[in-house]
C-alpha cells in the first residue's frame, strides 16, 4: 500500500528539502572554497583540515550545550515556531554572508554561526514531528523527510555546480560564482520553509508561565531526573550523543579530507552528488523496514556500518576509494538519521 503524506506532513518534509541544501553545501562546495581561501593565505593542507575540523567541532559543542534548554523551551506554548524562525534566519543570513567573506578566518567565524543557526532550527523542527503526524507514522514520515531532502537538495546544488565549474565560460570570477552559490542555497532553504510556516500548529505544549525561561530550566532539571529513572531513554540519549556526532563528522569532513589528500575537486563533488541519489531510496527503504523490524535493531545495523565506513576512510588513497565511500555513506546515512529522529520522538514524552 502506497504511503501518502498529509498536508501538514508534506509541509514538514519540505523543510528537510530546504535545509538539506545547506547540509550538501557544507559537505561539498564549502570545504573546497575554504581550501581555496586558505591556500591564498598561505595555510598548509594540514592547517586547512585542522581549522575546518575545529570550526565544525565548535559549532557542534555550542549546539550540544544549548540544545537541552532550547528543546525544553520548544515545549512551551507559543515558543517553538518563533524561535525556529529566529534560528532559520541566523542560518540563512549567515549562509549568504559566507559568499562575501574573502578572509579565511572571517569565513570560519561566519560558518560557525551558520552551523549554529542551522542546527538550532533542527532542534525545533525535529520536535515538530509529533505535532504533524501520529506515532505509528513517524518512522515513515521521518524517512520521507530525509529521502526528499537528499534528492531535492540536488537541484540548487547542481545549479550552483554548473555556475562554479562554468565560471570562466560565463565570464565571472570564482569568488563571484561562490557568492551566487551561497545565495541560491539560502534562497532555496527559505522558500522550502514557507509551507511549514504557513501550515504548522503546535499541538503538544506546556502552558506558558510568567518567567518562561526560568521555568524552562526548572523543567529541564525535572526532565533529566525523570530520564535517569528511565534506563532505556537514558541509554539511547547517551549513545545518540556520540554516534550521531560521528555521523555528522563524516558528512562535514568528507570533502575536506579528500581535498587535503589531493583528490580532484570535481570528482569529489560528483561522488557526493551520487551519495544523495543513493540515499534517497535507502532512506525510504529503512522507513518501511521499521514497520517490520524494531527501529533499535535497524539503528544498530547502521551504527556498525558507519563504524566500518570510518575505518575504510582511514585508508583512502584514490578517487575510486572515495566513490566507494560515498556510495556506502548514501546507503546508511538516511536510515540512521531518519530512524534516530523518529525513535527519539517516540520514546520521549511529547511535553518533555
List each model region and its residues.
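Juxtamembrane intracellular "pre-TM" segments in multi-pass secondary transporters
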Residues: 2-10, 201-238
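Helix-loop boundary and gating motifs at the non-cytosolic
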Residues: 2-60, 232-271
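Helix-to-loop junctions at the C-terminal end of transmembrane segments
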Residues: 65-79, 281-295
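Structural signature of the two symmetry-related core transmembrane helices
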Residues: 82-97, 297-312
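Helix-loop junctions at membrane interfaces in 12-TM secondary transporters
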Residues: 97-111, 314-326
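Intracellular juxtamembrane helix-capping segments at the cytosolic ends
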Residues: 120-134, 335-349
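Glycine-rich segments within core transmembrane alpha-helices of 12-TM secondary carriers
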Residues: 142-164
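C-terminal membrane-cytosol helix-exit motif in multi-pass small-molecule transporters
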Residues: 156-168, 186-205
